[in-house]
Swiss-Prot record:
It comes from the Eukaryota. Induction: Down-regulated in root tissues but up-regulated in shoot tissues in response to cadmium (CdCl(2)). Pfam families: CYSTM (PF12734). GO terms for molecular function: metal ion binding; metal ion sequestering activity. Disulfide bonds: none annotated. This is Protein CADMIUM TOLERANCE 5. GO terms for biological process: cellular detoxification; detoxification of cadmium ion; detoxification of copper ion; response to cadmium ion.
């Protein structure tokens, strides 16, 4: 599997990409939607991920 980055934090986009690789497109899209729902806004990163995901 993947080891976490040692010197730097994982970005949101990296985290979603990792979910996509590990669990598939549907899981990554749901993960992204849940993130946007929790922060009560649709951020640019969420839209990018949803468009690129499926």
């Amino acid at each position: 599997m993947y080891n976490p980055p040692s010197a730097q934090e994982m970005t949101y986009k990296d985290h979603v990409q990792r979910r996509h690789e590990e669990k598939g497109c549907l899981y990554a899209c749901l993960f992204t939607l849940c993130c946007c729902f929790c922060c009560y806004e649709t951020c640019e990163c969420c839209l990018e991920t949803l468009c690129c995901c499926c």
